[in-house]
Amino acid sequence: MSWGTELWDQFDNLEKHTQWGIDFLDKYAKFVKERLEIEQNYAKQLRNLVKKYCPKRSAKDEEPRFTSCLSFYNILNELNDYAGQREVVAEEMGHRVYAEIMRYSNDIKGERKSHLQEGRKAQQYLDMCLKQMDNSKRKFERECREAEKAQQTYERLDNDSNATKSDVEKAKQQLHLRTHMADESKNEYAAQLQNYNAEQHKHFYIVIPQVYKHLQEMDERRTVKLSECYKGFADAERKVIPIISKCLEGMVQAAKSVDERRDSQIVVDCFKSGFEPNGDYPFEDYSQHIYRTVSDGTISTPKQESLKPDPRVTVGKAKGKLWLFGKKPKGPALEDFSHLPPEQRRKRLQQRIDELSRELQKEMDQKDALNKMKDVYEKNPQMGDPSSLHPKIAETTSNIERLRMEIHKNEAWLSEVEGKVSQRSERRHSAEANHLVAQGRESPEGSYTEDANQEGRVQPQPHAHPEFDDEFDDDEPLPAIGHCKSLYPFDGNNEGTLAMKEGEVLYIIEEDKGDGWTRARKQNGEEGYVPTSYIDITLEKNSKGAVTYI
């Protein structure tokens, strides 16, 4: 199958077909360009998406690292790698497909133009030969007619008796001339005809088949190039499939790494305050003196002091802790983290001690290295001056002392926190035990069994007017055990808290029990809890000695 033999007379159609082939090549190149632009935009959008949702945390950020968050961040990293592979696909399409098609399209356009020009030249040469043959043919025809006319004239004059001899001779010469010219035209026509036939045979069997063969080869190469580009287009995707599969596998592994129990423990570690829950409210039996009057026949002074609940563990204190489940009052961050709950304070102090210990180890290693270098300099003075290291050694020694003092100070704070938490737990268990013992001593009739030990421990306080005790017990204010001065303003929005201004002087009626809150009273008698870290406390000597907390 050859275009030169099968399509010898289809030059115009072949010209249109080859032009269509080049247009189709350009169309596919445009498709590839738009396809790689889609890949580039897709990769860019993926990277922007990853950048948008990646965590923006500083090196000192202590955000809890939940496994679900870590898994999501790992998925974002894998997605970023996936976006990189989409960029590789776009780059591969651009280099191996689009650039190759554009280069080949320019080459094939020039080649097609050359082959078509060659075919047109061959056709023009054949047309010229045909025209020359036609001219010689018409000339031969014309000369033959002239010779025929000359012969008719000669025969007419030769048969005419009136014609002169000179006229006959002249007609005869004209006849010979026309006959000779006709013979020459005949020979020329024969030569032109033979030449045209030869050129026509050469044109249709040699020149045109060669031109069409080149066009056919060009078109077939174009088809092969398209096939290669189709394959390269698919190979660009196939080459990144293993890496993309690894990215997807990484996402699956990240999903499997989610641990709900660990996340729950992180929540506990992050928000555990170390506070103890409020104890049970004691039963306040106001009917004891009634039953004792009926049974004994006398009216005795009830042991109201022993029955009166401790105001420091009742409503006031419960209200003071409501911030644990509401909006925690904010204050300035202190060096000893006393503004934090006990458990969080303990964790932060331990973290700081660990950091300081690492810094101390670095400084000690540096000091050892400097001492070794100093020894080397002393043994080999040509290597350096030992005295040049003295400032650095002194600075390192100073840093070591400073870090040791910091560690000692933070360890003291840590011991204080751990001691307070332990004491608070012991107080709570002791209070619960006493409450259970008191309940166990109550008789079914509502009276109390006399206990010499208990009577020795708990003595009723005499009152000048016992008949008014029940009426004013709840309103009797607690005695002040010291005073304090507020260092910072406090809004006191939560129930049970006391608002105060900076520099305001308050009375202390209950010390901090390790929860970071101190009970105080204003000059106008208003009571409530204030943050211990917000005030400068001075206790009276007759209570526990003059002690100042800052």
Swiss-Prot record:
Classification via InterPro entries: AH/BAR_dom_sf, F_BAR, FCH_dom, FNBP1L_F-BAR, FNBP1L_SH3, HR1_rho-bd, SH3-like_dom_sf, SH3_domain
Keywords: Autophagy, Cell membrane, Coiled coil, Cytoplasm, Cytoplasmic vesicle, Cytoskeleton, Endocytosis, Lipid-binding, Membrane, SH3 domain
Residue ranges annotated for the REM-1 domain, each copy included: 339-416
Coiled coil: 66-258, 334-426
Annotated GO MF terms: lipid binding
Superkingdom of origin: Eukaryota
GO biological process terms held by the UniProt record: autophagy; endocytosis; signal transduction
Gene3D superfamilies attached to this UniProt entry: 6.10.140.470, Arfaptin homology (AH) domain/BAR domain, SH3 Domains
Site (Mediates end-to-end attachment of dimers): K165
Positions of region (Disordered): 423-467
Name of the protein described by the UniProt record: Formin-binding protein 1-like
Organism: Xenopus tropicalis (Western clawed frog)
Record lineage: Eukaryota, Metazoa, Chordata, Craniata, Vertebrata
